[in-house]
Amino acid sequence: SKEEVEDLTSNIILLSYLLGKRLGINYKDIDSSLQDKIKLNLIEDHKIEKWYGDLSELLEFLISR
């Protein structure tokens, strides 16, 4: 169901942030690295962006929060 997918996805994101913290990376640096990775994929014209526009949408979301 949609709720189960949302729950699993949010758990993956949560655990990624917590693992990063345990490895000495602060949350802000994780966000910054994520934005840099998205920008690089935009420059490299990643297929997911061509097909769906997901990368630019995600970058806008991250910048706006």
Briefly describe each language-model feature range:
Residues S1-T9, I13-R65:
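Flexible "arm" and connector segments at domain edges
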